[in-house]
Amino acid sequence: MLSATPWLGATVLPPTVTGPLREALTRVRYTTDAVRALLGPSAHAALGRGEVEPAARAARDGGELGVLVRLLLLGEVEPDAAVAAALAPLSPADAAAAGLLAPADDGSGGWTAALDLRPYGDEDGDWWVLSDLDRRHQERDHVTGVGAASLTLAAATDRTPVGSLLDLGTGCGVQALHAGRHARAVTATDLAPRALALAAATFALNDLDVELLEGPWLEPVAGRRFDRIVSNPPFVPGPARVDYVYRDSGRAGDDALAALVADLPAHLEPGGVAQLLGSWLHVRGEDWPDRVRSWLPPGVDAWILQREVADPALHVGTWQRDAGIDPASAAGRAHAAQWLDWLDGAGVEAVGFGHLVLRRTDGPPTVVVEDLLGDIADPLGPEVAGWLERVDWLRAHAADDALLGARLAVADGVVLETWSEPGDEGWTTAGSAVARLDGPRWRHEVDTPAAALLAGCRGALPLDELLELLSFAHDRPVDALVAATLPAVRELVRHGLLVPVP
């Protein structure tokens, strides 16, 4: 039974504006590829850093596309005639009546953007996204656009096809846009009416059918279950207040994330997966992995990846700058002092940030909490799908005899690294490691027998026969080798360095 009715608030763009605007954007080719080609690599990179002038120069002679880039991306005032030509068949007056444009306040009769409307796309497709302008950032209900967190979650989401998907806390709708390419039915929720209005406009502009529901957290979908849930929730730990709806939960510390992790699995179909971003506290005297594990309900596979760790000062300063607060101003210092006092009083030594992958399971759950610090080039989405498959295989081979009877091979893209140290007689081998050159680039140190075992993992012989050969070659009892090897083999399989061979 549904506990919420579809959101019926006023969208930012009425239907009389949506169609003509879509026609104009399509005609002018207002897409990520076209904008990148117009600006060139240098100016496009500068714009990504917030440096507007190089992009303005590059777009100066860009025709109607250049007009839209200067108007909608760079925030410049453009003449009425140029805007009318670029947006035709939509008139500037109708665009202004819908809240997309505003008359310039310089008396020129020109127009400026009242909303952020930008192209967005990747291998999933091309879209347009509506959000608030950065200059509105001080407003409590500010709706952010395609930011770093949105991109991080999108790149980490498993894209295997599913029947139903929930985008919890949709904001301007970025995750739901992607979901429309791999989910048959998409539901998006948000607490903020302004976010829902902008998301509705984004979906309409892209001709997407998304069910929109208004309400906090999981209340709008009470009693419902989904094949996949994605969420970029308000995860910034701090005092129990809401300065900005998009980032502050209203609950102290990481309490909101803890409650969400505990409640989400009940809204998953059997085998369903939830993927979300989150931040957790490193509290004095506590082990942070144990803290996060304690939030998990029974019957859930979980993979928690810590991607970044910030000390309290860095945490507060980062989010002040994100909100456009000058940390050196009197107001900024007072705001920081209150936040830092709260963190200190709660015994917080650091704040972690990362990914949480939760899967509803009927089997013995697998829970892995680990660090993945530093930059990685490849998206994590395929890795999440692979990790879940490998967990299933390991669960089916949980008994030692089952694992010993399996045939394994070193995965493509895995290398053996050896390093040496200088000694009295030259270089001396100091150690070795196997490492993936793709995905998370997991790396495991190995000794000489382990390296020899991996060299034999070619999918021809089962693991028990390889260990017998290794026992003979290194004069070590096979039972001792089995006891030492099986935990490491399971970890290498889990990290994708060893793959099962049918």
Residue ranges, per PLM feature:
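Conserved SAM/SAH cofactor-binding pocket of Class I
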Residues: 147-231, 237
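Conserved Class I SAM-dependent methyltransferase catalytic core
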Residues: 192, 253-306
